[in-house]
Amino acid sequence: MIPVTRSALYLDGVSVAFDGFKALNDLSLELAQGELRAVIGPNGAGKSTMLDLITGKTRPDTGVVLFLGQHDLTSLDEVEIANLGIGRKFQKPSVIETISVWENLELALSGNRSPWRSVMQILNLQDRRLMKDVADRVGLSDSIDQIGGSLSHGQKQWLEIGMLLLQEPEVLLIDEPAAGMTDSETMKTAELLRDLAGDHTVIVVEHDMEFVEALGCKVTVLHEGCVLAEGSLSHVSSNNEVIEVYLGR
């Protein structure tokens, strides 16, 4: 029986084992629609496995994973989950470096188009407006004709977030966006993700505590595949168990 929930994402009692190692161990997590949530934890805590689980790359051995209270993600494949409205941005940008920002955005337009057919076809007015709005939202409106390979690392991350937005996701899964960014890019990225929350549910997996602090959102600490603590960053940072296993003090 599917639990009654209006949450964007609902994970209950999820466990995943690889060759006897429990990557997730009775993990339970719930995110409200439009929420921004940071997920932190030491290496091997289960953060990446959790994202793999939500996107259908990994199947749970036990547990429930619901999207919008009605879609059982454990029964769907990666394409079906993406089409429902769950988008993932990996740590390393996948921007095509030989084409422009505009053309990268065009490739990402949702709809039944093959990638290179998208590039060649004439955009309608609605498409152009949407792409311009997204470029402006991610701070790339002045770089729209710039070749992808000439962008800074931070700009590539923003472009990839823009490409995800064009797919109209309900949930954005963002994996370590601050890695390799300058301080100013890091703060701008935090501002962007705060702005996206509300319109989208945003999960950010991150190691940079200054970046997490800038997000100003609820924090979930994972350890050994389950939730160790939740709350504001100041709250979890003062938790003795978190200090012991994560902060190393």
Where are these regions (language model features)?
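Helix-to-loop junction immediately C-terminal to a conserved catalytic motif
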Residues: 55
